[in-house]
Amino acid sequence: IIALSVFVTELLSQMTLEEKIGQLNLPVVTSEIVTGETLSGNVVSLIRAGQAGAVFNAAGYETVYGLQKIAVEESRLGIPLLFGLDVIHGYKTCYPVPLGLASSWNMPLVEKVGRISAIEASADGINWLYGPMLDISRDPRWGRCVESPGEDAFLNGAYGTAMVKGIQGELRSDSEILSCVKHFALYGASESGMDYRETDMSPERMYNVYLEAYWEAIQAGAASVMASFNDINGTPASADEWLLNEVLRNQWGFDGFVVSDYNAIREMSVHGLGDASEVSKRAITA
C-alpha cells in the first residue's frame, strides 16, 4: 500500500502545468444559473483534457456517474472529480429551511438532517455539499436571511458544528462527504442588506460576533470553505490574504481547501481590480 503523501507527490510529478491549473477549474454543467455567466465551453472536453478538478451543479445519477467515468477512464491521468452542489435544506427529502431548523434549537436533529442529506446526495455521486451557510444575518433587507441559522453567534456556531458532523461523519465511508462552510466571511453584513455590497467592520466586532460560527465549524472538522462575494474593509474576500491565510490558516489551523463563490474571480475584474491574470493571481496567493 502506497502512502497517500507518496501517491500524491508522484501524481503531481506526472502532471503538466496545464493539468495542475485545470485542477483549480470548476465548470458548471447547466445554464440555469442566474448569477453571472455560465460556462461556454464543452464540459466533457474539459474533463477529457484534464482541465477540470470539480464540477458544479451536476445532479442525478446518470449525469454524475457519466462525467466521473469520463474523468477516470478517458483523461490522461484518470483523476476523479469532485461534484459540488448546493443542498440548502435537504437533497431528495425536503426539510425546514435553515432559519426554521435552527429555531428548533435541536442540534441532534440538525446533525441528522445533515447525515440524511449526505446519504441521499452521495447515492447520486455527489461528494461535496456547499453548506452549512453560517452568515450572521441581522438586516432583514438582505435577501438570503432564510439560508442562515439567524442572528445569534452562539446558535449559528452550534448549528454549523452539528451540520458539519452530520454531513462528514468521519469521512470514512462513501456516504460521508465533504462539507463547505460558507460564506467566509461577513456576507450577511453587507451594506444596507444589499447582496455583494461592501462590509465595513471593526476587528472586535468580527471576532466577537461574525467570525465565531465559522470558527466553530472549522474546529468541527469542515473540509472546505467558500469565500464570500463581498469585500471586507475594501478588499474582496476572495483575494483577502489576511482573511484566508492569516485568520483561516494561521490563527485557526485550517488545513482544507478554499473555493471561490460562483463567478467571484471574474467579478473582481469586472469591479475594477485588474484583468483576469491579475485577479487570478490575487486569489491564488491570498
Q: Model-found features: residue ranges?
A:
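Glycoside hydrolase catalytic-domain context in secreted enzymes
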Residues: I1-A286
